[in-house]
A protein has these predicted regions:
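N-terminal hydrophobic/helix-forming segments and targeting peptides
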Residues: 1-432
Length: 432
């Protein structure tokens, strides 16, 4: 893959992924165009050797895999997450303030709050609509497509300390303005009325919703030599696209099952039925193995397969900030063009160990892929990600990797395009 194609694929995913549900839709579209067949998690039909399948997990997470051609010695797994720090719209959200309608929101994950101010914001997510069967409501995706909300700053004349750093409160400072009250006598239910009209349904048919405030700005290639990509949701759509590229652009192996999993809810701890902290991955792995023809169906045989498996957990890493180099480890700085970052933490906030590091090093050296090692500054406590969580539920060696970015958890982040290409190349080599 060349640099421009790598960037183009990522940019297209970002444009189509206003919410995690839209990321799911775009990922499924890419997989189906590449010949992957959808199967149900509840099915137990025999899988065809060499064939490619995908499974939707509660419409919130996704697994795609290629069945081995013959035999079954282990899994080669790459994981990522589809959610990002943002704000979600609460029930009964409309509030009258001055002559404006604002929306009551809840913080999702750990966003850098002030980066959401004064930006054009969209609303996207899903609504559940009543049907004749109460146990089977209909789900519909929603995307306002155009900017419909803004969270305005307080003018410096009214907030003289703003440039010294002012704490923002979600309930007080971060309710987005979405309309003027005007002649609207009753604003309760106003938002659902707008959404229902766009979807062509009755407002009272909407039973519930999960709606996100989203940064609606376009990704932008920047730098005098076009080195950078500035965009919303680089955490963690960079990794999602590398996962998809790897599973789509490689063929089934003889006796190893290549598998990618895109999880939801990483940004809020992964403790959900569709998150990495659930039993869902181990259940999928076991079903794949048991439904593959000519495998030993014993529990012991499956455990042996897992012990011969390897997982790469992909999530963005911290590049060294040029204005704050003191925040990085003094002997392990991470350049923007660091390529594949091997994330290490001896207290196991990252799952990486010496054996896993050596495997990644070997692949990168053989393929001449840029790579480096990340450790936290000795006086800082870093974040965790999927690798350590997955290591508690599946007995497979795991390594945490990512591309280096700046402004992680900002509403708009920055990366070097070459690092995305390096991760694309690594993920493909990992599956070969």
């Amino acid at each position: 893959m060349e640099l421009q194609e790598s960037t183009n694929r990522l940019v297209e995913l970002i444009r189509h992924s206003q919410s995690p549900y839209h990321t799911m839709k775009e990922a499924i579209s890419q997989l189906e165009k590449a010949g992957f067949e959808r199967i149900s998690l509840a099915e137990s039909a025999a899988l065809e050797p060499g064939k490619a399948y995908y499974v939707s997990i509660y419409d919130r997470s996704l697994a795609a895999f290629r069945v081995p051609q013959s035999g079954f010695k282990g899994f080669c797994i790459i994981t990522s997450h589809i959610d990002n720090p943002c704000f979600m719209i609460k029930p009964n959200p409309e509030r009258k303030k001055s002559d404006c309608i604002t929306l009551n929101v809840e913080r999702y994950g750990g966003p850098i709050l002030n980066t959401w101010l004064d930006r054009p914001l969209t609303i996207a997510g899903r609504v559940c609509v009543a049907t004749d069967d109460p146990f089977n409501p209909k789900t519909m995706l929603y995307n306002s497509k155009k900017p419909v909300a803004v969270i305005p700053n307080l003018a410096i004349h009214m907030n003289r300390e703003v440039n010294k750093g002012v704490e923002l409160k979600v309930q007080t400072d971060l309710e987005p303005i979405v309309s003027l009250i005007g002649a609207k006598e009753n604003t309760q239910g106003w938002l659902l009325g707008k959404i229902a009209a766009e979807l062509g349904i009755e407002a009272d048919s909407i039973l519930d919703y999960e709606l996100f405030l989203c940064n609606g700005e376009e990704p932008s290639i920047t730098g005098f030599d076009d080195e950078f990509l500035s965009a919303p949701r680089l955490d963690n759509l960079t990794s999602c696209q590398s996962c998809l590229n790897a599973i789509m652009d490689t063929e089934a192996l003889s006796d190893i099952c290549n598998l990618v999993v895109l999880f939801d809810n990483e940004e809020c701890g992964s403790s959900s039925k569709q998150g990495a902290g659930s039993v869902i991955l181990s259940s999928i792995l076991e079903k794949i193995y048991l439904n593959t023809p000519d495998t030993d169906k014993s529990r012991t045989a499956f455990i042996d397969v897992m012990l011969h498996s390897l997982t790469a957990s992909l999530d963005v890493a911290h590049a060294m900030h040029p204005n704050h180099p003191e925040k990085n480890d003094p002997t392990n700085p991470i350049p923007m063009e660091g390529g594949v970052v091997i994330k290490m933490n001896y207290n196991q906030r990252y799952a990486t160990d010496t054996n896993a590091v050596s495997i990644v090093e070997g692949i990168c050296r053989a393929e001449k892929i840029a790579h480096t090692k990340f450790v936290n500054h000795g006086d800082a406590v870093g974040g965790g990600t999927l690798g350590s969580i997955l290591s508690t539920s599946i007995p497979a060696m795991t390594v945490d990797l990512g591309v280096p970015i700046l402004a992680m958890h900002s509403s708009r982040e920055l990366m070097a395009r070459s690092s995305q290409l390096a991760m694309d190349q690594f993920a493909e080599a990992f599956f070969k």
